[in-house]
Amino acid sequence: MAKNKFNTAWLHDHINDPYVKMAQREGYRARAAYKLKEIDEQDKLIRAGQVIVDLGSTPGSWSQYARNKLAKGAQRDAEREGGIDGTIIALDLLPMEPIADVHFIQGDFREDSVIAQLEELVGERQVDLVISDMAPNLSGVAVADAARIEHLCDLALEFSQNHLKPDGALLVKCFHGSGYSQIVEKFKRQFRVVAARKPKASRDKSSETFILGKHLKRPA
């Protein structure tokens, strides 16, 4: 009975959520697009000409937002191939419905074959921005969930260390709780500028927080 009450309450909140309605109206696949939009408007992360990698991209709302943002710059050059001023590469283990001008690679970004596809798309350039809305399946066991969350952040940090340009940025989702301070410390060891962001589009009941790292530190 309690589970049914929870599901009913969640469905009620979801249906009446203004960001859900806005996403449906504006064609975004998930309300998460507005979390990235708010952070981007505050921190000016997405700019014309960038190479952007979206880790754990499915269903694709973050890639959609990035694509729409880069398309505005491309309007000045209607003949530009691809229709956007920049490159967006989305990666996920799960399939993702195509998005115009977004390159999608399905697979584990730790595998050599996936990295080879990424490097072919990037060419001689380095990545300007890595974004990750990845989240594990939470079990409700605090210690286990904290370890899963930290593991995903570690993967994003390692990917950024290998592929991000020196003045690039990494934005990842994490959750307040056990292990949060360790994740922040790892960001501080890797980036010169670190900030936490809690966009209004993030539900009040949620402990999710986004950590932003800018400007890689040189390896010791």
Swiss-Prot record:
Classification via InterPro entries: RNA_methyltr_RlmE, RNA_MeTrfase_FtsJ_dom, rRNA-MeTfrase_E, SAM-dependent_MTases_sf
User: Which superkingdom heads the taxonomic lineage of this protein's source?
Assistant: Bacteria
The GO terms describing molecular function are: rRNA (uridine-2'-O-)-methyltransferase activity
* Catalytic reactions on record: uridine(2552) in 23S rRNA + S-adenosyl-L-methionine = 2'-O-methyluridine(2552) in 23S rRNA + S-adenosyl-L-homocysteine + H(+)
| Annotated keywords | Cytoplasm, Methyltransferase, rRNA processing, S-adenosyl-L-methionine, Transferase
Q: Which SUPFAM superfamilies does the UniProt record give?
A: S-adenosyl-L-methionine-dependent methyltransferases
Q: Family membership, please give it.
A: Belongs to the class I-like SAM-binding methyltransferase superfamily. RNA methyltransferase RlmE family.
Task: Supply the name of the protein.
Answer: Ribosomal RNA large subunit methyltransferase E
Organism annotation: Paraburkholderia xenovorans (strain LB400)
